Amino acid sequence: MKISPTKFLLSRRNAMAISMIEPRSAWYDIINEQGKKTKTLSQNIGEIVGYGPHFFIVRRSVWYDLYDESGKKYKTLSENIGIVTSVTGETFVVRRSAWLDTYDRFGKKINTRSAR
């Protein structure tokens, strides 16, 4: 299921930014910028590899799933894109061989540069 960026932005009007994702037993607690737990997700969704203020990335088997701040999955990418190395603000960086690819939070590649 694809969500257009416009619909995505409209749907998160009342959403608060992610402050922290806290692992607890077999769960992940999503904590907003006011310090309140907004959602609890099972760790069965996979391993959280990083998060920004409005999204987080989960590695599940050979897939990367993108979730919004309310805990809804909105995009799945193959691990063939590379290894997620960092998540900052509204973007994330993936290392693919000798290249670093930058993606926006919607999973669209926006830049490629040499990893040196």
Annotated model-derived regions:
Residues 2-17, 41, 45, 49:
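Charged, amphipathic alpha-helical segments
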Residues 3, 25-43, 64-79, 102-114:
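Surface-exposed loop/turn elements that mediate protein-protein interactions on large endomembrane-trafficking
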Residues 8-10, 14-23, 52-59, 85-96, ...:
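Short beta-strand elements that form the blades of beta-propeller/WD-repeat-like
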Residues 41-51, 55-57, 76-87, 93, ...:
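Residue-level detector of conserved, function-critical positions
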